Swiss-Prot record:
Belongs to the DVL/RTFL small polypeptides family. This is Small polypeptide ROTUNDIFOLIA LIKE 3. One of its GO terms (biological process) is negative regulation of cell population proliferation. The gene is RTFL3. It comes from Oryza sativa subsp. japonica (Rice). Pfam families: DVL. Residues 71-91 have a biased composition (Low complexity). The keyword Transport does not apply. It comes from the Eukaryota. InterPro entries: DVL, DVL_RTFL_regulatory. Residues 1-23, 60-95 are annotated as: Disordered. Keywords: Cell membrane, Developmental protein, Glycoprotein, Membrane, Transmembrane, Transmembrane helix. It is a single-pass membrane protein.
Length: 124
């Protein structure tokens, strides 16, 4: 039995200009292809989660600051640890982006060489 959800309907296979696209060349998904809960999950960025944790940290430190000297030093240590975690997370994220760019360049270089080889081979 074939799964119907993987088949392209005639409306999804056509662009706004009316030209049809083959399923093999359609690499990008439209936001209407996903349900609303997945769309909100995919649209959130890393910075949104960082700002949410930052607001929770300031609320916690404000509540603990009035308790005395021990709790305020503990809250400042906690804030320092969270700032280090956030900087480590951003460094990891930027490292992943750099690695992805390098991999993309390497793949593009290989494809370019293959295409030039095929073009030269066809000329012979």
């Amino acid at each position: 039995m074939e799964d119907e959800r993987w088949k392209l309907s005639s409306s999804k296979g056509r662009s706004k200009s009316g030209r049809s696209c083959s399923s093999s060349s359609n690499y990008y998904y439209h936001s209407s292809d996903f349900n609303s809960s997945n769309a909100t999950t995919l649209s959130r960025s890393y910075s949104a989660s960082v700002t949410a944790s930052r607001h929770a940290t300031t609320a916690w430190s404000a509540a603990g600051a009035g308790g005395g000297g021990a709790s305020s030093s503990s809250s400042s240590q906690h804030q320092h640890q969270q700032q280090q975690q956030q900087s480590n997370n951003s460094q990891r994220l930027s490292k992943k982006c750099v690695e992805a760019v390098k991999e993309h360049r390497a793949r593009f270089y290989i494809v370019r060489r293959c295409v030039s080889m095929l073009v030269c081979w066809r000329d012979y």
